[in-house]
Every structure is written in structure tokens, then in C-alpha cells.
């Protein structure tokens, strides 16, 4: 009888210690799973605000830089074109080819004596537009052969004054037209340069939204991959399942194992109590 009593008591203490170890194990796994879930949620909640701030900063800086650089470039281009237009107007006769103008002035001063009193630029433009001798000046830059038709013109001027008047009328209006047409055509070129500068701004501004989409994708994957990977079965199930249900299956398994251990504990306690009463009675 004493042997049965001692065996029952030893069995009772062994079962109690075994159940305590199991309970501590399951409780530790449950606590670890809950802790890992809380860490994941905190990481996922903390990462999107930082990503949004980074995106906003990048977009603002990109847009500001693109707008400033594009507009500054457009303004500089417009100023440069305007300056070039003014230079072209000022040096219509002498700026392009000073040597050619000097040769033209020696070879073809003008068709009549009246046009010599006008400016050199007007004389050069008038002869370049309609004077047949000017074509000879282009083909012969030295101006040797051009002087001969000029002598013929001076002889015809001395013979008849009517021809001189007709030549002055035929030569003077083209100078005015050339002078008036050249400044008007150049502002049109300056105006045409402005839309091209505006068109160069548009692709830079349109490229900003694309850099946003790639930034969002990178931030999301970076936040997911930077988490510490755990090798337990319960955490693998969390990665495979939804975020909301993460840990639900593991908690149910832990609860079922705890229930089974409790049932075993109750059965063994009842058995030991029955044996103890039987022994003592």
C-alpha cells in the first residue's frame, strides 16, 4: 500500500511539472507571435508616412528645379535672339561681309549720283536687291570687271537726265522695303524661338510624375523586405496569409494544444485523486 501511495505521489508531481513546462512553452510561443505581430504592424504603419514625405520632397525639388531651369533658359534664349536681331538690323550692310561691302562700294557706288548721299547700308541693300551690276560683284569679288558697266552707266547719265530720274525711282523704294522688312522679320524669329523654349519645358515637367510611380513601388517593397525573417511555422503561415488574419491560425492551434493539455491534466488529476482516496480509505 505504501508503494502505491508513493508511486501515485511521484506520478502526480511528474505530471504537474510536465504540464507546467508545456504551458510555459505554449505561452512563450504565443507571446512571441503576438510580439512579432505587433512589431510588423508598427513597421508597416511607420513606413508609409516616411515614404510619402520622401516622395513629396523629391517631387517638389524636381518640379522646382525643372521649372526654374527651363524658364531661365527660355528667357536667355529670347534675349539672345532679340540681341542677334538688333545686331542684324544694325549691321545689315557691313556686319555680314565687310570685305564684300568695301569691294561693292568701290565697284558699285550707286546707279545714280543722287543715291550716293544715302547711307552705305541702304546703298548696299539696294544694289544687292535689284542692281544687275551687283551680281557681277558677287561673281567677281575683286571687282575688276564690275567697273566697266559702271562707266557705261555714267555715260548714259551724262547723255540723258530722264534716265537718271527713272533709275533713282527704281532704286530708292527697294531700299525702304528692305529696311522695313528686315526688322519685322527678325522679331518674328524671336517670337518663334519662344514657343520652342516652351516646348522644351514640357517634357521636363511631364517626366516628374513618372519618377513618383517608381518611388512608390520601391518604398513599398523596401518596407516589406527589410523586416526580420522568422523561421517558425506560425510566422510562415502569417507571410502566406492575409495581414489581418496573421496570427489567428497560430493562436487557435496554441489554444487547441492548451485545451488538450488541460484535458490531460484533468484526467490525470482525477486518476490520482481516485487512487489516493482508494489508498487512504
Curated annotation (Swiss-Prot):
Species this protein is from: Plasmodium falciparum (isolate thtn / Thailand)
Keyword Heme: no
Record GO biological process: cell adhesion
First-listed, main subcellular location of the protein, grouped into a coarse class: membrane
Positions of GPI-anchor amidated asparagine lipidation: 255
Gly residues composition-biased segments: 54-76
One GO CC term on file: plasma membrane
Compositionally biased residues, Polar residues: 150-174, 181-209
Keywords: Cell membrane, Disulfide bond, Glycoprotein, GPI-anchor, Lipoprotein, Malaria, Membrane, Merozoite, Repeat, Signal
Span list, region 3 X 8 AA tandem repeats of G-A-S-G-R-A-G-A: 51-74
Domain of life: Eukaryota
Organism classification: Eukaryota, Sar, Alveolata, Apicomplexa, Aconoidasida
Intrachain S-S bonds: 238-246
One Pfam family hit: MSA_2
Job of this protein: May play a role in the merozoite attachment to the erythrocyte.
Residues annotated as glycosylated: 22, 36, 158, 230, 254-255
Localisation per UniProt entry: Cell membrane
Protein known as: Merozoite surface protein 2
Topology in the lipid bilayer: Lipid-anchor; GPI-anchor
Region (Polymorphic region): 44-207
The Sequence repeat ranges on this chain: 51-58, 59-66, 67-74
Composition skew (Low complexity), residue ranges: 77-133
Protein encoded by which gene: MSP2
